UniProtKB/Swiss-Prot annotation:
Homodimer. Forms cis-homodimers in the presence of Ca(+2) and forms monomers and trans-dimers in the absence of Ca(2+). Interacts with NEDD4L. N- Glycosylated. Contains high-mannose, hybrid and complex oligosaccharides. Ubiquitinated by NEDD4L, leading to its proteasomal degradation. The modification Phosphothreonine is found at residue 199. One of its GO terms (biological process) is L-glutamate transmembrane transport. CDD domains: Tweety_N. This is Protein tweety homolog 2. Keywords: Calcium, Cell membrane, Chloride, Chloride channel, Disulfide bond, Glycoprotein, Ion channel, Ion transport, Membrane, Metal-binding, Phosphoprotein, Transmembrane, Transmembrane helix, Transport, Ubl conjugation. The chain crosses the membrane at residues 45-65, 88-108, 214-234, 241-261, 389-409.
Length: 534
């Protein structure tokens, strides 16, 4: 069984975290031995949380300084173009989003590991509680049989064997053996208080773990939602989404540093326990259970003897002696006193049941079962649980870094959106290729019919009247296209023949549109040339 004890070895991260300096609030060194009830030890853990709070303050100071510089300092456009500015914002957002997604992935893994470790601890505590409760039940049940049930049968047999002194001596001897068994069983430790403490610890662990797991899950969802808002804000160039991202990012930044403080303090405290768990358990159970019994279960050494060996051996010998005496009475006394058979058979059945309880008790008080539960609990705390806390701490740090980057990129994106809107405002509204003019024309009614080619054949006889009147510059190109469409097809619709009235192609004139435009123009020239010859 010595090999089972070697199975637990404090991992390297436990030693590394335990080596973190423990300093009190007065900046004095504190003993790193795990003692949660000690006020100085509690101050050392609180000091670690204050270190994270100081880091949060420095982070906020840096962000405020950067935001002030970004809002009041003007950048030279000759040195860095707008296109480069937009590209820089995009890549900053991409990097921040990737860091945030990586942080959430690490956080999910750490949250799952911590949850597994906590539930493994709870299962081990429940198994140990089941063993302790079984020991107490067997001891109390056997004591009840020896003190009450056996006494009743012996009292009736004493009345039956009143005329035989030798049989009365045998009954008295059986009664002495039963008293010896009761005395030996009373020497076994009572685990009732230990069971209550372990049950309370298991319930508290489950309660805290449930809300811890749920809180981190909500924090992961919040971080992903903030990343989504940031992507939508940059894609739609929405200042409202950008402002929401900045506010939520600041909140998540505070939560990230707070979770880092909690994870760091919890990880250091757990490592202090995992370095020497036996010492802490011996100190806690010193007033409830003997040190010999505690060491027997903690170390379970094959070379050491069980503290219950003498008690169990005496119990077994007493049962064997009583069974021999009862068998002798059944053989010699029943032929003379037939009324004693029922009580003797009942005593024999009671002794057989007590022997079965003895075997169960021997198996339960053996150190191997409880020592396995102890090792499983240590594995849940010091391996899965502590690893999960480290991953959660890494998540908190990466999330703080990602949201700090997002907050830094926010003012630059805001200024870029403002500059882009200002550039749109500087464009001439009469420009037919202005995107704003196209949007305004699509939502406004037509401004009136323009002169079409039909108005040029109005019946004036002079040759000069055949020339089309000068086309006025219109700031509603959509209406002009619709009027020309009504001329040729009677239905107002958009055509692929732009700017017919102006007789000039747009700058982005495709070959197909050019061919269509030239064919229509030639047809119109031939038509009007035949009707109005020079």
């Amino acid at each position: 069984m010595q090999a089972a004890r070697v199975d637990y070895i404090a991992p390297w991260w436990v030693v590394w975290l335990h080596s973190v300096p423990h300093v009190g609030l007065r900046l004095q060194p504190v003993n790193s031995t795990f003692s949660p009830g000690d006020e100085s030890y509690q101050e050392s853990l609180l000091f670690l949380g204050l270190v994270a709070a100081v880091c949060l303050g420095l982070n906020l100071i840096f962000l405020v300084a950067y935001l002030v510089c970004a809002c009041h300092c003007r950048r030279d456009d000759a040195v860095q173009t707008k296109q480069h500015h937009s590209c820089c914002i995009t890549w900053t957002a991409v990097v921040a989003g990737l860091i945030c997604c990586a942080a959430v992935g690490v956080g999910f893994y750490g949250n799952s590991e911590t949850n597994d470790g906590a539930y493994q601890l709870m299962y081990s505590l429940d198994d140990a509680n089941h063993t302790f409760s079984g020991i107490d039940a067997l001891v109390s049940g056997t004591t009840q049989k020896m003190k009450v049930d056996l006494e009743q049968h012996l009292a009736r047999l004493s009345e039956i064997f009143a005329a035989r002194g030798d049989y009365l001596q045998t009954l008295k001897f059986i009664q002495q053996m039963a008293g010896s068994v009761v005395v030996q069983l009373s020497g076994l430790p009572v685990w009732r208080e230990v069971t209550m403490e372990l049950t309370k610890l298991s319930d508290q662990t489950g309660y805290v773990e449930y809300y811890r797991w749920l809180s981190y899950l909500l924090l992961f969802i919040l971080d992903l939602v903030i990343c989504l808002i940031a992507c939508l804000g940059l894609a739609k160039r929405s200042k409202c989404l950008l402002a929401s991202m900045l506010c939520c990012g600041a909140l998540s930044l505070l939560l990230s540093w707070a979770s880092l403080a909690a994870d760091g303090s919890a990880a250091v405290a757990t490592s202090d326990f995992c370095v020497a768990p036996d010492t802490f358990i011996l100190n806690v159970t010193e007033g409830q259970i003997s040190t010999e019994v505690t060491r027997y279960y903690l170390y379970c050494s094959q070379s050491g003897s069980s503290p219950f060996q003498q008690t169990l051996t005496t119990f077994q010998r007493a049962l064997t002696t009583m069974q021999i005496q009862v068998a002798g009475l059944l053989q010699f006394a029943v032929p003379l006193f037939s009324t004693a058979e029922e009580d003797l058979l009942a005593i024999q059945l009671l002794l057989n049941s007590s022997e079965s309880s003895l075997h169960q008790l021997t198996a339960m008080v053996d150190c191997r079962g409880l020592h396995k539960d102890y090792l499983d609990a240590l594995a849940g705390i010091c391996y899965d649980g502590l690893q999960g806390l480290l991953y959660l701490g890494l998540f908190s740090f990466l999330a703080a870094l990602a949201f700090s980057t997002m907050i830094c990129a926010g003012p630059r994106a805001w200024k870029h959106f403002t500059t882009r809107n200002r550039d749109y405002d500087d464009i001439d509204d009469d420009d037919p290729f202005n995107p704003q003019a196209w949007r305004m024309a699509a939502h406004s009614p037509p401004r009136g019919q323009l002169h079409s080619f039909c108005s040029y054949s109005s019946g004036l006889g002079s040759q000069t009247s055949l020339q089309p009147p000068a086309q006025t510059i219109s700031n509603a190109p959509v209406s002009e296209y619709m009027n020309q469409a009504m001329l040729f097809g009677r239905n107002p619709r958009y055509e692929n023949v732009p700017l017919i009235g102006r007789a000039s192609p747009p700058p982005t004139y495709s070959p197909s549109m050019r061919a269509t435009y030239l064919s229509v123009a030639d047809e119109h020239l031939r038509h009007y040339g035949n009707q109005f010859p020079a």
